[in-house]
Amino acid sequence: MNLSNLKPAEGSTKTRKRIGRGPGSGLGGTSTRGHKGAKSRSGYSKKIGFEGGQMPLQRRVPKFGFKNINRVEYKAINLETIQKLAEAKNLTKVGMNDFIEAGFISSNQLVKVLGNGSLTTKLDVEANAFSKSAVAAIEAVGGNAVKL
């Protein structure tokens, strides 16, 4: 047995359909395209989303609203979370790097500090945005809310 005399197993391969090679081939004439109509012509392709004349899905479903390209999304972090982080790492100043190291945000996200929970230690908090209640709670303990 050599590479030169290997053959596929009996019945494992089929001969290719050679379309449009005369009536004797069995696939001549209309060449499997039927008679007339757009689908029989060269260059035909139906439009994307075309459903045979039925109203297509993208026109049946109502269209509401849009995505504002100028929207700024913030990751919300509450005061109770900041308090736990400060206690765990014994911090007096909490900033973006601390949030990234703790896994609260990724490096390209913006942070908004919200006022849920309470602070018991004096902290300087750096973030991109603060709610009014968060600023009030931070300053009530003697800390600073630094907007980046």
UniProtKB/Swiss-Prot annotation:
A single MF term (Gene Ontology): rRNA binding
GO biological process: translation
Span list, region Disordered: 1-51
Keyword annotations from UniProtKB, A to Z: Ribonucleoprotein, Ribosomal protein, RNA-binding, rRNA-binding
SUPFAM superfamilies referenced in this protein's UniProt entry, alphabetically: Ribosomal proteins L15p and L18e (SSF52080)
Gene Ontology CC entries for this record: cytosolic large ribosomal subunit
Residue stretches of biased makeup (Gly residues): 21-31
Database matches in InterPro entries: Ribosomal_uL15 (IPR030878), Ribosomal_uL15/eL18 (IPR021131), Ribosomal_uL15/eL18_sf (IPR036227), Ribosomal_uL15_bac-type (IPR005749), Ribosomal_uL15_CS (IPR001196)
Pfam family, one: Ribosomal_L27A
Protein family: Belongs to the universal ribosomal protein uL15 family.
Subunit field text: Part of the 50S ribosomal subunit.
Role noted for this protein: Binds to the 23S rRNA.
HAMAP family (alphabetical): Ribosomal_uL15 (MF_01341)
Name of this chain's protein: Large ribosomal subunit protein uL15
Organism: Phocaeicola vulgatus (strain ATCC 8482 / DSM 1447 / JCM 5826 / CCUG 4940 / NBRC 14291 / NCTC 11154) (Bacteroides vulgatus)
